[in-house]
Structure formats: structure tokens, C-alpha cells
From Swiss-Prot:
Name of the protein in its database record: 1-(5-phosphoribosyl)-5-[(5-phosphoribosylamino)methylideneamino] imidazole-4-carboxamide isomerase
Keywords of the record: Amino-acid biosynthesis, Cytoplasm, Histidine biosynthesis, Isomerase
The protein's Enzyme Commission number: 5.3.1.16
Pathway terms, separated by semicolons: Amino-acid biosynthesis; L-histidine biosynthesis; L-histidine from 5-phospho-alpha-D-ribose 1-diphosphate: step 4/9
A biological-process GO annotation: L-histidine biosynthetic process
Organism of derivation: Legionella pneumophila subsp. pneumophila (strain Philadelphia 1 / ATCC 33152 / DSM 7513)
């Protein structure tokens, strides 16, 4: 299983949100390029970078910074505000390894399909963020500010028909809380769609959580807040 460090960007700084809330932001003193270089030296094979300003505004704001981070030598999957073919092509042409498409996949499936066809499915990661109400994982959009009526399973089934294989799934209730991932959700995801390369994000506390996710068949795990709090030796995980 691939371990992917995450870097969230806001106004050019490394930050973390609690449960996706923009009114609960923790800023970190380390600069994004320094953070990317740190992960590169530890042996990370990939970074997950989110432009929170872009996610909120609907247009990526920090592409130049993200490209500078990728010059450290780590392939980057990046998202936050990619909501047009022009923006997707700009990111792809700038050298971003994989584009992370979130809200657009829910609000504008036709445009999302055009982007998939233009960029190629293997270069796309769908980021599907859910709130689990009455045991049904419903998708949130626009930087988690709004809820949709679409379920995770409906959307995955739809995009699977267009060649999508990489899906990043976050249970918002777990994100930034350090209380453990939603293992039931990921177990269902792998059982329902075993051919999808699932990436798990949110709530990972320690090595046992990663071991459990691996045993469920998850392809990759995104690590965020815990890496700033030294809860885990990342170098050991990456070896």
C-alpha cells in the first residue's frame, strides 16, 4: 500500500482544516516547498496537494507554488478548484502528475467526462468526500461547504464506465480528528468496487490503522495532520 503525505495550501502556507471547516484552520510554520523537500528526502513516492483557496473559489489559485513543490522530485496529485477543461489542461501541461477532481464530478458530470477523455482516466483521481447519514455515504461539494443528494456508490458506478480507477474517499467526520478512519466505509468500498484503486483519507492515528486499511484492500493512504504532530515515523513507513 502506498503511503502519501498530504499538504493543504491556503494563501501560500501549509494548513490543516478540522472536518473541512474553513473557520477551524491550523497554520504551520514550515513553508510548502520545504515540506515537500522533507518528504522527498524521506523517500515519499507521491504527494497529495490541495489548494484550499481554489476549492473554495472554484478556480485553482496556487498552481505556480504546486509546480515548484513538484520540482523537489516527487510526483504530485493535486486538486482544489479544477472546474474547467482549460484549468485541467493548464495543470496537466504544467507537469502535475495526476489531477484530483472533486466537486465537479458531482455538479457537472458532462464536463468531468470531457476532462477525463482529454487528460486520460489514469491521470485523474476522483476525490469523493462523504458524510455518512443513516448509513448512506452522501457526497459533499465545494470545499465541503455544501451537501449533495448523490451517494458515493452511485457516483463511483457512473464514472467506472468512463475508465476511472483511482478514487480518494474521505469521511469528513474523521478528517483532522485523529480518532481513526471509518473502516466500515472502506470495507464496503472495496467489497462493492474491488477493481477500484481506493485511497483512504482522514483519521489515521498510528501504524495499526494503516495495517488495517491495507488488510481491507485499500491501495493508498493519505496522511495529513499526524505528520505535523510526529505521531508516526514516516521514514519507517516509506521504507
Amino acid at each position: 500500500m502506498l503511503v502519501i503525505p498530504a499538504i493543504d495550501l491556503q494563501s501560500g502556507r501549509c494548513v490543516r482544516l478540522k472536518q473541512g471547516r474553513f473557520d477551524q484552520v491550523t497554520q504551520f510554520s514550515v513553508f510548502p516547498i520545504e515540506r515537500a523537500l522533507h518528504f522527498a528526502k524521506l523517500g515519499a513516492k507521491r504527494l497529495h496537494v490541495v489548494d484550499l483557496d481554489g476549492a473554495r473559489s472554484g478556480k485553482m489559485q496556487q498552481l505556480e507554488l504546486i509546480c515548484s513543490m513538484q520540482k523537489t522530485g516527487i510526483p504530485i496529485q493535486a486538486g482544489g478548484g479544477i472546474r474547467s477543461i482549460e484549468q485541467a489542461l493548464e495543470c496537466s501541461n504544467a507537469g502535475i502528475s495526476q489531477l484530483v477532481i472533486g466537486s465537479l464530478a458531482i455538479t457537472n458530470p458532462d464536463l468531468t467526462i470531457q476532462i477525463i477523455e482529454k487528460i486520460k482516466p489514469e491521470n485523474i483521481v476522483l476525490a469523493l468526500d462523504v458524510r455518512v447519514d443513516t448509513k448512506v455515504p452522501l457526497l459533499a461539494i465545494n470545499g465541503w461547504q455544501n451537501n449533495s443528494t448523490s451517494s458515493l456508490w452511485e457516483v463511483v458506478s457512473y464514472y467506472e464506465n468512463y475508465g476511472i480507477k483511482n478514487i480518494l474517499c474521505t469521511d469528513i467526520a474523521c478528517d483532522g480528528m485523529m480518532n481513526g478512519p471509518n473502516f466500515d466505509l472502506y470495507q464496503q468500498a472495496v467489497e462493492y468496487f474491488p477493481q477500484i484503486a481506493w485511497q483512504a483519507s482522514g483519521g489515521v492515528r498510528h501504524m495499526q490503522d494503516i495495517t488495517t486499511l491495507n488488510s481491507l484492500g485499500i491501495s493508498a493512504v493519505i496522511l495529513g495532520l499526524m505528520l505535523y504532530q510526529d505521531h508516526m515515523n514516516l521514514e519507517e513507513l516509506l521504507c
